[in-house]
Amino acid sequence: MLASRMSFERSRDHEAYLSRLKQVPRYIDQTLEMLRNGMELGFLPPAVTLEGVIDQISSQVGSDPQQTLFYSPFGSMPSTIDEQDQTRLQNLAKTVIGDQVQPAFRKFKEFMQTEYIPLARDTFACLYYPTGSDYYGHCSRRHTTTHMNAMEIHKIGQSEVARIRKQMQQVISEVEFEGDFAAFIEHLRTDSSFYHDDPEELLRGYRDICKRADAMLPHLFGRLPRAPYGVRKIPDFEAPRSTTAYYRPAPPDGSQPGWFYANTHDLKSRPRYEMEALALHEAVPGHHLQLALQNELENLPRWRTTTHFTAYTEGWGLYSESLGEAMGFYQDPYSRFGQLSYEMWRALRLVVDTGIHHLGWSRQQAIDVMLENSALSIKNIESEVDRYISWPGQALAYKIGELVIQELVQDARSKLGQRFDIRSFHDHLLEEGSMPLDLLRSRMESWIDSNL
C-alpha cells in the first residue's frame, strides 16, 4: 500500500521509496517490542482475530524479491528515467528487499507463530483484560470524545435499532414482499440479481455514482476541495480479510489523488443496493470531501490539518449517507433499504460493541444480533464482529458522531427558520477540520446564535 500512495516519475522518487523500505526492519523491531510489552502486561488479542495473519505475512515475504509487492515500482519504470539508472535502481531494490525487508518479515512471522499466537486468548471482552471495564471506558471516551458510559451508549443503540427497523419494514411493505423481515433479508442475500458478476462492472458502478454525486455538491457546499479522487479495487493480497471499502486520503503535498478503495473479492457479498450509500460515505460528500478540505485549510497549523478524531470524521461519513436523498439518490426502494441497512449497521455497532466488551457477549451472540437486524452479508458481519472484538470502542464513534451532527442540523433549522442555509452550515462545520464532539457542538451553537 505504501507504493500506491507515492508518485514514481523520477529517480529520486524511487530512492525515497527505498529509503523507507530500509526502515522496515526498525519498524518491525519496534512493533515486536510493543507486542512483547503488551504480553507482559497481560494484553493479548483473542485468537479469532489473528486467523489469517500468518498467510498475510507470508504474502509479503516470498522467495524472489522481484515477485514481492515491494518491488512493484521497479517492474515497469517510466521513460523519464534512462535505462542505466533504471538498472541501477532495480538492482538496489532487489538488494534492499532481499537483505532487509524479507528477513524482517520472516522474523515477524516467526514471532507470531512461536510466541504470540500460541498465547492468544479464547475470550473476547475487555472485561478479561487486567484493567477490565476501566480499559473499555477509556476506549469509549477516546473514540467518541464524549463522557457517555457503556450502558448509555447501549440504550441509544437499542433505540436507534428500533427506529430504523420500523423504516426498513415500511420499505418491505412498499415492495409488497410476501414474508417477514428475516425472509426479506434472505431474499436480498440470495437473489443473484442484486449482485455483480464482474469486478470491473462493480468498479464502474461506483465511478458512475461518484460522478453523479460530484455534480450535486454545489447545492450543498459553498467550498469544495481542489484535490481529485478516484476509485480503485482493494489489492488482492488484502481483499479476503478486508472490509467492503475504505478511503485513503491524498498526501499533504497533493502529489497524489485521494482513493476510494472498493472490495471486489467475493462479489456475492457486495450487493448493488448498498453501493450508493457506501460511495457517498467513502468519497463525496463523505471522507474525500471532508479530509481533502481539511488538508487544504490554510488558516491552521499543519498538525491541525492532519489530526483526526474518529467521531468527527466517521460521524461526517455517516451523516453524508443521509444527504443522498437530497442529491437524487435512493430513488428505488432497494437502494433506500440499502441506505437504511447501512444506518442500521452503525446503530448495531452501539449495541454489539458494548454488548461484547461491557456485557460479556459471545462472538456468536454478537453475530446473531447483526444477522437478525441487518441486510449485511454473513461474511461482512463476521468480519465486522471480529473488528469490534479487536478494536474496542472504535466502532461507537460513527453513530455517536452522526447523531451529534444531525442534532446540530435540526437545531439550526429550528432556530434559524428561513435564514437557515445548508451550504453555510456545512462550510462552517468543516472549516476548522476534525475536532472533539463537545468542541464541535460549542462552535456550531455559536454559529447558530450569530445568525439569529
Model feature map: region roles:
Residues 1-452:
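N-terminal maturation segment of proteins
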